Amino acid sequence: VDITPEFNPLRIPSDRRLNRIAGPSSLIIFGVTGDLSRKKLMPAVYDLANRGLLPPGFALIGFARRDWEDQDFEQVVYEAVKQYSRTKFDEDVWRQLAQGIRFVQGTFDDDEAFQTLKDITEELDRERGTMGNHAFYLSIPPKSFPLVTEQLRRSGLADQKEGHWRRVVIEKPFGSDLTTARELNAVVESVFPPDSVFRIDHYLGKETVQNILALRFANQLYEPLWNANYVDHVQITMAEDIGVGGRAGYYDGIGAARDVIQNHLLQLLALTAMEEPVAFDASSLRDEKEKVLSAVRLPKDLSTATARGQYAGGWQGGEEVVGFLDEDGMDPESLTETYAAMRLDINTRRWSGVPFYLRAGKRLGRRVTEIAVVFKRAPQNLFAEDQTSALGQNALVIRVQPDEGVTIRFGSKVPGAGMQVRDVTMDFGYGHAFTEASPEAYERLILDVLLGDPPLFPRHQEVELSWKILDPIEEFWRTQGQPEQYRPGTWGPASADELLARDGRTWRRP
């Protein structure tokens, strides 16, 4: 096969059997001294290189205020890779990667630093063969986006020439409400065209989240049941067993709903509830997700359809932990919630009358993220009531983390002479079923940015629709005073249990 600049069989978008390899390019990280960069981004870049998915001439550039030289930054990357990378360390791979590591010292308002950055990218184009293809990763607070994007425009770094690309990657939060999300989007898209803007939601890079599409649409088994005729309700849970810790300053004023429900959980809802797209491409996937999000309706009485809480101090896992209001740097009068739950309805024929319950919180019973599709009970004409008294509702549970996989719960006869039906589970785990190791979410997403492959990245319409759902709830909560306290290690405040009890349901115990 002849490989030319126009044709490379390892980069054919329609062939998804093999991992495609990124073309000549560089990744420029702003906020390179932060935790995300050290624990996720740098190790992910190394893991991609180790798997042979980065080109030989790839370059990694850090931009920060630290008074570092290239070799200082190289040492920082080295230590991050040794500590956090998923794949085994290989000296040859590291040596090849390290040749392309550069550092630019400066602040975001320093014109000279951005000119230096431009000079370095041009030097890398010549020496490393990055060919004018550069991705800017903004791992920085949203308030800095306008300044950095304007500097990229003014310095000419954002200019795209024919046959080359420039892309920008934005980390959540995408604003704090609909108004700020629109302002943020206008700022970024005034410099970069919409198809060059990649909004990172790392949950969408997780293997199980992408498997929702395969589970639903590659199989005949589930889709006929995936509707209001058979589904009783859906529960989407994101629980953490830790507190806010060192993020107290960031977390205060944001809370559980803005932090994870607006992005992660509403994306999971959209993938669970959407119709089958006409093609497995970015535009078709996004169209269907947007249709679902635009069909979401809030119940009229938010006092009975939402719940929120703050974790108190107490004992969890054999150790004493402080309450949210006593965390270092926390305002003792804070009204920010660490637990949020809500009922949402979807106004489509498929989901008419099926409530979607979303919950997220910190200092809960265990760390778990899952989607539980709970089915209606079968008519019990055949069995006596005492024969099925131990039988719950059938459920299909998609575990996003930890132990990625799928569980199906159904009734089976208990061994013995009598007829007793009890719940059993069938369990599929990624770690057991496949010899291939799942890539870390950021590996997949960084590679997709370098390939220009956008299906896993929400566009600004999705972000705005998510805020339209959440904003009325946040406005209502602002009138409700102090959130309810809940004990650490439990599953949230009593009001969350009451939310489901009003509908005759209970939360699953993950």
Predicted regions and their residues:
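Secretory/organelle targeting and membrane-embedding segments
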Residues: 1-170, 174-510
